[in-house]
């Protein structure tokens, strides 16, 4: 058995994983779908344990357990949950355990990656989440909104005449809209208008939160972006930002190596 740690981030859309060495470097990593895919762990050395963040429910937990058991029977497993304090981060939630494990691990990863900086962490998945993290590691609170895809899908499902637009289709529509400078960012047909409107709603939320946080804290705040829809939302942002797409796995590595 190696000193490596298997890290698993089970979100609502995909399951991401990494194998981290004793220096918390990712030796290898990947992602797979919940039902239709599986990771190839056949050549990986046996880790000393698995650290799991799961916000996708019981079915995802059972599948992860089955995958681990098939490759490394009886491997020790730790299901990560938010706590009052861990790895230099303190939890400002009134009930700390109710904070999602992915958000908690992401906060720990962000605090380590950008030490001594005030942060606003925006993660774009099924939901869009924002976390306000002070330079001293105190999580001051957050916001949760529908993600870009969920926002577009909700309009298609709950209105009589609006279409349901996927992320891939919306991205192509926005490319077309950007080529027509005479109208951008305003669209002259419904699919373009829906795609651009939901994208601008995401960007507007982020920019408003960032400006409000800098005003409240009277100090610079680094805006950190993460998540699958970040590529699209970046195109609508007009404020400085930094990308970091492994915050949760980085946080899980820190939690694992502090155990």
Swiss-Prot record:
Q: Which family does it belong to?
A: Belongs to the type III pantothenate kinase family.
- This chain's protein is named Type III pantothenate kinase
What is the top EC class of this enzyme, as a single word? Answer: transferase
Positions the record marks as coiled coil are: none
Q: Which GO terms describe its cellular component?
A: cytoplasm
Note the superkingdom of the native organism: Bacteria
Instruction: Please describe the quaternary structure of this protein.
Output: Homodimer.
Q: In which pathway does it act?
A: Cofactor biosynthesis; coenzyme A biosynthesis; CoA from (R)-pantothenate: step 1/5
Indicate the residues that form the catalytic site.
102
Q: Which InterPro entries match?
A: ATPase_NBD (IPR043129), Type_III_PanK (IPR004619)
Which GO-annotated molecular functions does the record name? Answer: ATP binding; pantothenate kinase activity
* Keyword set includes Nucleotide-binding: yes
Q: How is the cofactor bound?
A: A monovalent cation. Ammonium or potassium.
Q: Which reaction does it catalyse?
A: (R)-pantothenate + ATP = (R)-4'-phosphopantothenate + ADP + H(+)
**Organism for this UniProt entry:** Burkholderia pseudomallei (strain K96243)
Q: Which residues bind ATP?
A: 9-16, 126
Give its localization: Cytoplasm
Indicate yes or no for the key word Cytoplasm: yes
Keywords attached to this entry:
ATP-binding, Coenzyme A biosynthesis, Cytoplasm, Kinase, Nucleotide-binding, Potassium, Transferase
EC number(s) per UniProt? 2.7.1.33
Q: What is the lineage of its organism?
A: Bacteria, Pseudomonadati, Pseudomonadota, Betaproteobacteria, Burkholderiales
| Cofactor(s) this protein requires | NH4(+); K(+)
**Gene Ontology BP term (one):** coenzyme A biosynthetic process
